[in-house]
């Protein structure tokens, strides 16, 4: 029984104010209660201690979600993480909060797709010809961060979730 949604209401049982992850100490000092819970939850999820399809981070703007996510990622090699957003402007915003340590792309690029328009003038993603699944950016990283997931088409979101689950990737969605 996998849970589909994981919010900020996780009750954690940690000893002290820090956790160890990938041989690095991740301090919870300076975080408020909600941020501490989120960082602890993300770390537990990344370590495989939570049986979830993905880790959902939600909350009002200005509550420190970006700051807390960066704190949780400190225990990972930057090459293991890729961030993606629906549009180029959203990608740039994600890049601003993740910093230069991590690769950030559009969702289309993450999946090796290009943007086109259907007969109604709606933007759609289509698979690029000749793109092998193993060469896609989503396949080269262990942790996938999707920003503004509500802006992504349901079919594309389902494809990302399926790839992450089939290929044992960790998916963090905002």
Q: What are these regions, as identified by a protein language model?
A:
Residues 1-174:
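Conserved ATP-binding/catalytic motifs of P-loop helicase motor domains
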């Amino acid at each position: 029984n996998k849970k589909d949604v994981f919010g900020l209401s996780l009750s954690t049982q940690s000893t002290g104010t820090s956790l160890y992850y990938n041989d690095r100490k991740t301090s919870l000092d300076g975080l408020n209660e909600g941020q501490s819970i989120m960082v602890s939850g993300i770390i537990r999820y990344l370590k495989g201690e939570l049986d979830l399809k993905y880790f959902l981070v939600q909350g009002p703007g200005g509550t420190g979600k970006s700051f807390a996510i960066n704190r949780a990622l400190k225990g990972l090699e930057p090459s293991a993480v890729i961030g993606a957003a629906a549009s180029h402007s959203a990608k740039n915003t994600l890049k601003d909060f993740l910093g230069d340590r991590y690769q950030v792309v559009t969702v289309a690029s993450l999946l090796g797709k290009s943007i086109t328009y259907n007969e109604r003038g709606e933007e759609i993603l289509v698979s690029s010809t000749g793109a092998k699944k193993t060469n896609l950016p989503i396949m080269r990283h262990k942790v996938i961060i999707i920003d503004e997931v509500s802006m992504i088409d349901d079919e594309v979101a389902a494809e990302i979730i399926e790839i992450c689950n089939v290929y044992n990737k960790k998916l963090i969605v905002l």
